[in-house]
């Protein structure tokens, strides 16, 4: 390390340049080399008070930043410092835009800070208006569901269940510097790997474990059995519905036939005789006894069979005594009404068959022919003889009313 040279050594090394640099050297020497000072000491022991002068040398240390080479003696400025918060990360763009949207006074009717003036939450008063007019101004979409999903991603929670009010510990009114503390939630790596594996297995159709294959097969078999059972129930219900529709149609047809039959009986008294003649011509008489009973019934149509039954019952009670058996009389009384009722029942069945077989046009022609062959004056003042036989036609058909 070289030591600084004194002016005397510098002059000795360069004798020729002594005159040229005398002015600069003298000024430098005056600055660097202090002038000797003398101090006077008064002594009381010497004659005449002789004053002794002793030279004292003052050393001046060079300050930091001063050079010895004769340059400018300036102060070096301190090194530059980085700006405050230059290395820190700012808030997320979504959080910053959401804060600007909530703090904007022009959107208070749609979204604003929560009631109470605390500023710890914000409320979306009109989600439809927010999605239609406010979100496109701050974001690149107009979907309210996507906005809520992003709020959940950044840690916002719904405060009130009956309205869209959200809050976060670092999302406060007037404290925008806290927004940098709101970070996006990151999914853990194992969870991401499991989700990717699940997606891959679903895409390629491969189950995760053999146990899942067994459970899927069991569920498939159960679903197939349930489908088969539902098909059977559907077929049974369909067949029952078809049978019920057919039964309803038959009942309606029988009702219409019954109404038409009674209407024709009331309008044309010869209609019953025509039906009986058709019955005789079709089936014939089976035996002389049966023909005789039918003739007796036609001749004695004025007598009511119900009255005959009542008279027969009274005769039976009068003839039977406490000491006698009376078997013959009782047997005679019991067999006769039974035969009449059976014959009438068979005749009614045949009447139904005749009604089904006769076409409508033929029946109308028969009515016209019957009406034309009788005069109205013949029926005036003469009671109808077939009225008493109507109960025998009504009793077998009581099932229509029920």
From Swiss-Prot:
Residues 1-28 are annotated as: Disordered. Pfam families: HSF_DNA-bind (PF00447). Residues 216-266 are annotated as: Hydrophobic repeat HR-A/B. One of its GO terms (biological process) is cellular response to heat. It is found in: Nucleus. InterPro entries: HSF_DNA-bd, WH-like_DNA-bd_sf, WH_DNA-bd_sf. Residues 212-258 form a coiled coil. A motif (Nuclear localization signal) lies at residues 290-293. It comes from the Eukaryota. Keywords: Coiled coil, DNA-binding, Nucleus, Phosphoprotein, Stress response, Transcription, Transcription regulation. A motif (AHA) lies at residues 349-358. The hydrophobic-rich region (HR-A/B) corresponds to the oligomerization domain. AHA motifs are transcriptional activator elements. This is Heat stress transcription factor A-6a. It comes from Oryza sativa subsp. japonica.
């Amino acid at each position: 390390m070289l030591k600084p040279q004194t002016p005397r050594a510098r002059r000795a090394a360069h004798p020729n340049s002594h005159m040229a640099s005398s002015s600069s050297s003298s000024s430098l020497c005056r600055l660097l080399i202090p002038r000797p000072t003398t101090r006077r000491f008064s002594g009381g022991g010497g004659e005449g008070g002789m004053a002794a002068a002793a030279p004292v040398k003052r050393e001046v240390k060079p300050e930091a930043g001063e050079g010895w080479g004769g340059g400018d003696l300036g102060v070096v400025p301190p090194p530059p410092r980085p700006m405050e918060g230059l290395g820190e990360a700012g808030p997320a763009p979504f959080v910053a835009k959401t804060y600007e949207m909530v703090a904007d006074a022009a959107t208070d009717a749609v979204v604003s800070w929560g009631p109470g003036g605390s500023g710890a939450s914000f409320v979306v008063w009109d989600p439809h208006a927010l999605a239609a007019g406010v979100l496109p101004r701050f974001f690149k979409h107009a979907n309210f569901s996507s906005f809520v999903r992003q709020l959940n991603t950044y840690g916002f929670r719904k405060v009130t269940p009956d309205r869209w009010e959200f809050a976060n510990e670092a999302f406060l009114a007037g404290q925008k510097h806290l927004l940098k503390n709101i970070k996006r939630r990151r999914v853990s790596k194992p969870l991401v790997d499991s989700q990717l594996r699940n997606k891959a297995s679903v895409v390629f159709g491969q189950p995760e474990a053999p146990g899942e294959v067994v459970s899927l097969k069991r569920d498939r078999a159960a679903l197939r059995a349930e489908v088969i059972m539902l098909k059977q129930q559907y077929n049974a219900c369909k067949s029952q519905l078809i049978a019920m529709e057919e039964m309803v149609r038959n009942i309606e047809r029988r009702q219409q036939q019954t109404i038409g039959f009674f209407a024709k009986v009331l309008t044309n008294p010869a209609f019953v005789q025509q039906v009986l003649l058709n019955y005789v011509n079709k089936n014939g008489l089976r035996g002389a006894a049966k023909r005789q009973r039918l003739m007796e019934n036609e001749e004695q149509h004025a007598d009511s069979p119900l009255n005959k039954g009542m008279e027969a019952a009274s005769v039976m009670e009068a003839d039977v005594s406490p000491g006698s058996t009376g078997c013959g009389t009782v047997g005679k009384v019991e067999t006769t009404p039974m035969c009449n009722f059976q014959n009438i029942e068979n005749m009614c069945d045949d009447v139904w068959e005749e009604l089904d077989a006769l076409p409508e046009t033929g029946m109308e022609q028969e009515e016209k022919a019957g009406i034309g062959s009788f005069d109205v004056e013949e029926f005036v003042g003469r009671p109808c003889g077939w009225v008493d036989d109507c109960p025998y036609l009504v009793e077998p058909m009581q099932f229509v009313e029920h």
